[in-house]
Amino acid sequence: MKTHVKALVVGGGAVGTGIAYHLAKAGWDTMLLERDELTSGSTWHAAGLLPLFNMGYATTHIHKYSVDFYKSLEAETGLNAGFYVVGNLRMAQTDARMDEYMLYSSVAETADVYHEFMTPKQIRDRWPLVRTDDLKGAIFHPQDGYINPADVTQAMAKGARQHGVTIERKWQVDGYKWTGSEWIVSITKMVERGGNLLPSDETAEIHAEHVVTATGNHAQRTARLLGIKIPAIPVEHQYIVTEPDPMLQEYRKNHPEHPVLRDADAKWYVREERGGWILGPYERNAPARFLYDVPESFRADLFPLDLERIETEYLSMIHRLPSSETTGLKDDFNGPICYTPDGNPLVGPAPGLRNMWLAEGFSFGITAAGGTGYYLAQMMVEGEAEMDMASLDPKRYGTWMTTEYAARKNEECYAHVFILHHPDEEREACRPLRTSPAYDRQKARGAQFGQINGWDRPNYYGPVDAPAEFDHNSRSFRRGSWWKYAVEEAKAIRETAGLIDATAFTKHIVRGPGATAFLDWFTCNALPKVGRINLTYALTPTGTTRTEYTIVRNGENEYYLVSAGAWTAYDADYLRKCAEDKAPEFGYIEIHDVTTQWGVFAIAGPNSRKILAELIRDANPETALSNKRFPWLSARKIELGMCPVNAIRVAYTGELGWELHHPIEMQNYLFDQLIAAGDKHGMKLVGGRAQNWLRQEKSYRAFGTELGRDATPLEAALDRFVDLSKDFQGKQAMLDKGIRSLCCTLLIDGPADADPWGKEALLLDGVKIGRLTSGGYSVAFNKQIGMGYVRPDLAKVGTKLKVRMFRELYDVVVVEDGPFDPTNARIRVDG
């Protein structure tokens, strides 16, 4: 057995073999270890469905690659991958479900995923066994279907071997040790004894520069060995196989196989299986399993079937396929399928570790295996994937995440597979968990909360006496009933003042003798002078945008960094690793995460100075907030009543405003003072949805939408924040990329009852030329607004395009950056 490799992949399911294949194809010396046999985990009992349907941009690309890749495997390896291209039909019982499919259609169009819409009559004419009288329609993917999980895994394994991969079975990993340049992986030979797989006395060590874990149901053991948290915990998934259906058998004499049928409103999928049907429900109350480890006795095993739990779904299958009523039950499966709290797998660098890569938590592992291997190999070999993989990054979960949280959220995620996935969806499990001190005060004033990175923060403020189900019932693919409240909040910031809770912001202190030199290299903008702030970006080594920072310079070698609240662990990990790498060159650097030490209120609007003037304690309170003493883009320590505040004159809404960073234990006092003063000046409490609209009126980019690892700051049209006179990480790579596409702001004459969500395709003469990354409503222009990426030649002011919403085309025009108050007069106003 080899003992030294470039990359070691741990786990021989579909995901692990897909990764090994693509690493070897990219030229890396790769070994794959499997503790049992290939496919012996969840792969063996997977139903093998290959749904192209997914609302996520990155995941859609992963699924699309897999489907195309699997079709090519036989030609390369000589092994039939068992791919049945029967298509996939997603039916809709409600208008809301059809709205969901139309929004998905926009995502699919941006990724070039072919699909069709069908009427109930078209469905019935083509597949007469399907009852359609209560359907509104369907969306059909003719190019996907299902695959034999064992066959496709073996085909990928053969392809991997052809590219030089060594596959070793019956070896269990027992330890990982990082030497500073490689991993030493301790392994033990597993042997069969009495039907169980047990460790033997034979051990070995593998030296690997890189390690990828794709350990499926064993992710908690992997987490323990690595000393990290991995929120990948399996949930029971049942499916049943019926006896042959005589009417189906008769139909098949003259017709091809049915597509995979999905009745999302009934929470199930069905496909043909040897003259009968497979029913796979996603029912409520499916329990999480293996919260801490998989028992040694559990191999290719299953759990007892719980028919009572899926009775509703079974009866609804009979309703949709009446011929199935007389068929008996032939077989059943109830096995563990891994989930994560948000349903996306964990793909990318492990938190806090070097050259350790995770590929865990796949609930649709067969669908994702090929694409994950392709894009993860790009990340490992080239430094970044060709698209932004941040939505799958393991560090989207921080150290606050516990096993109990992951288990409960994973159960919820399983039960939500087929619910309506509104863009304004907020799930209720494990909430509230992380809250700012003012949570109860905000709730008493009508706050309806959303959860980001475990934090509950206001999305908008509804009626004070709203029932518990108000927010859930407000959701829509069009303008939900929350929309009017967000409009009033946005108007308040433009006309009077608004107060936003931004406590969830990520906050770091960077200081020490090497801090200035490090941050000058780490970010692309010039560093601010003491007492001033700037907006800047940390780049990846490949020149794309990794993190957006507001930097406050507290002293010659002390800086306060503020970044997006959703990405605390993601930002901290990169910041620390880069600082560790550069400390020998630049000198000692301290990094402190102070996120939970400081609360933040953002006050903005024409009356914001008047409100703060009532509270400020200063020898000359009339001038304390003037442009002379407190200019735009500066920071000062002030006192608001009895609360010390680190105030920053900046506003994400494009109005006169300040961020008020305060000791978190004084938040309720400060909140009460601001409310009392603000009530005299028309101030409203404002949530994140109104803020999102307002920042688009100013063309302020947001991380995760306009900003990410698939575009450079220059492509994001942020040239003014890039100092090309200095050296910084990723500079040359950024310049070498050129301008492949360009970010711009667009005003949209859209439908009367809907706004774009930032998922829609942009077209010129019927040809896709870009996509929206953000969307919403503009109170300033009284129409829809959006931001997105287009071909560089089309990013000019006045360019007319089209956007597709609800299968209709609407007029779009490219406008100047910051179309509202383009000279920033309102932000700079004196007083």
Task: List each language-model region with its residue ranges.
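Beta1/beta-strand and adjacent pyrophosphate-binding region of the FAD-binding site
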Residues: 2-15, 31
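Glycine/proline-enriched, intrinsically flexible loops and inter-domain linkers
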Residues: 387-388, 393-831
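Glycine-rich FAD pyrophosphate-binding loop
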Residues: 24-44
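Dinucleotide-binding Rossmann-like beta1-alpha1 core, especially the glycine-rich loop
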Residues: 48-126, 265-270, 275-278, 411-425, ...
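Flavin-dependent oxidoreductases
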Residues: 18, 176-303, 312-315, 320, ...
